[in-house]
Amino acid sequence: MASSLPWLCIILWLENALGKLEVEGNFYSENVSRILDNLLEGYDNRLRPGFGGAVTEVKTDIYVTSFGPVSDVEMEYTMDVFFRQTWTDERLKFGGPTEILSLNNLMVSKIWTPDTFFRNGKKSIAHNMTTPNKLFRIMQNGTILYTMRLTINADCPMRLVNFPMDGHACPLKFGSYAYPKSEIIYTWKKGPLYSVEVPEESSSLLQYDLIGQTVSSETIKSNTGEYVIMTVYFHLQRKMGYFMIQIYTPCIMTVILSQVSFWINKESVPARTVFGITTVLTMTTLSISARHSLPKVSYATAMDWFIAVCFAFVFSALIEFAAVNYFTNLQTQKAKRKAQFAAPPTVTISKATEPLEAEIVLHPDSKYHLKKRITSLSLPIVSSSEANKVLTRAPILQSTPVTPPPLSPAFGGTSKIDQYSRILFPVAFAGFNLVYWVVYLSKDTMEVSSSVE
């Protein structure tokens, strides 16, 4: 009996302690409920804090959980963020056992909240699964923290003059929809450097690198007053890998391939013609496919200029062969005319002693196609019987063909145009590439955003 007494005392003490905790817990919850009831008693959520008096300051900051994708065709981007707003409402001050009241989204509809909207947003979604993704806290001094998880689809104006070596500053603009500057102002909670956070793992872009972000604020005027606009600029630099593989390398290889025709024999007309036409069609196909990933802008981009110059080189190679073929034919015709006037005629005279059978015959040459008729020598008039005797005695005429003059080395060798083209075309194309890449890669192509205030 004496040994069980200490255990009995311990059990009674534990029951007493647990009872006190339960009573304190019930008292705490009842006290918090009483605090909320007192806060909402006589509270009008239609009026902003300090209505008719001081300006309400709304402090904001943004945490980006996912950035991308970015659409060049639609000129827009998408991101998932935690959008936080903090302001002070003197009507919600309280005292009690707790310093912070952590409440759910049901409380949001019962108090005043800023009417913030995204000015350049095309579509914004507030997540509601499994419950509305909202955080709401009230501090003892009346400071309120209101956080929402949003997916924002915003407009990103792009000027693609330097595409694909371009960079863009995609803005996110927000402010009050109804309250002018005289009633609500927005500020950055953590200053201009730390109010927008974008972790490295949050950026999942295929064609861009997110190299940083800057913030600014401005005041705009409208018919209904002056409004404070907060802006975040997300700086994006385009990646070159895709376009080097799909556009630039095929264009360079096509131009080099077109210049191979300068080394093909000028007499191979079908081969060089097919070569030139095929490379021209290839460049046409590349230029069409390059535009598929771009909006229909009215100006030329850096890639358009490169493709245009490559197309000019390929087309010039085809024109070069046309010139070679033309001048080759011209030289051929000149050679034929020279051969016509330089070749001596073949004289054929019968071996008979009679002078009546002399006749000059100029035989046509099969290669130069030169024909000329020579009038036979006049024969004296004789009787038919004598003529028959003469013709019977006349031997068969024999002729010696004219040997055509040999072709000159310049006519049968490589064209001078081809010789010059073998040097000029590669040098010119290499010079163009040198200037093109030095200019664009050393150029600051990032769009300039507004200055930070």
UniProtKB/Swiss-Prot annotation:
Which Pfam families has this protein been placed in?
Neur_chan_LBD, Neur_chan_memb
Subunit info?
A: Heteropentamer, formed by a combination of alpha (GABRA1-6), beta (GABRB1-3), gamma (GABRG1-3), delta (GABRD), epsilon (GABRE), rho (GABRR1-3), pi (GABRP) and theta (GABRQ) chains, each subunit exhibiting distinct physiological and pharmacological properties. Binds UBQLN1.
> NCBIfam families under this entry?
LIC
Q: Which UniProt keywords apply?
A: Cell membrane, Chloride, Chloride channel, Disulfide bond, Glycoprotein, Ion channel, Ion transport, Ligand-gated ion channel, Membrane, Phosphoprotein, Postsynaptic cell membrane, Receptor, Signal, Synapse, Transmembrane, Transmembrane helix, Transport
What is one process in the GO biological process aspect for this record? signal transduction
Give a brief account of the tissues where this protein occurs. Answer: Expressed in brain, in cerebellar granule cells.
Q: Name it.
A: Gamma-aminobutyric acid receptor subunit alpha-6
Impact when changing residue 180 to H: In a colorectal cancer sample; somatic mutation
Q: Where are the transmembrane segments?
A: 244-264, 271-290, 305-325, 423-443
Q: Name one GO molecular function term.
A: GABA-A receptor activity
Q: Which PANTHER family match?
A: NEUROTRANSMITTER GATED ION CHANNEL
Q: List the ranges whose topology is Extracellular.
A: 20-243, 291-304, 444-453
Coiled coil ranges (UniProt) are none
- What topology does it adopt in the membrane? Multi-pass membrane protein
Q: Which residues are glycosylated?
A: 31, 128, 141
The cross-references to CDD domains, in alphabetical order and at most eight, read: LGIC_ECD_GABAAR_A6, LGIC_TM_GABAAR_alpha
Which cysteines bridge via disulfide bonds?
A: 156-170
- For 4-aminobutanoate, which residues are the binding ones? 84, 147
Q: Which domain of life is it from?
A: Eukaryota
Spans within the Cytoplasmic topological domain: 265-270, 326-422
What is known about what this protein does? Alpha subunit of the heteropentameric ligand-gated chloride channel gated by gamma-aminobutyric acid (GABA), a major inhibitory neurotransmitter in the brain. GABA-gated chloride channels, also named GABA(A) receptors (GABAAR), consist of five subunits arranged around a central pore and contain GABA active binding site(s) located at the alpha and beta subunit interface(s). When activated by GABA, GABAARs selectively allow the flow of chloride anions across the cell membrane down their electrochemical gradient. Alpha-6/GABRA6 subunits are found at both synaptic and extrasynaptic sites.
Q: Where found?
A: Postsynaptic cell membrane; Cell membrane
The signal peptide here is: 1-19
Q: Which residues carry this modification: Phosphothreonine?
A: 403
Any Gene Ontology CC annotation: postsynapse
> Could you give the domain comment from the record?
GABAARs subunits share a common topological structure: a peptide sequence made up of a long extracellular N-terminal, four transmembrane domains, intracellular or cytoplasmic domain located between the third and the fourth transmembrane domains.
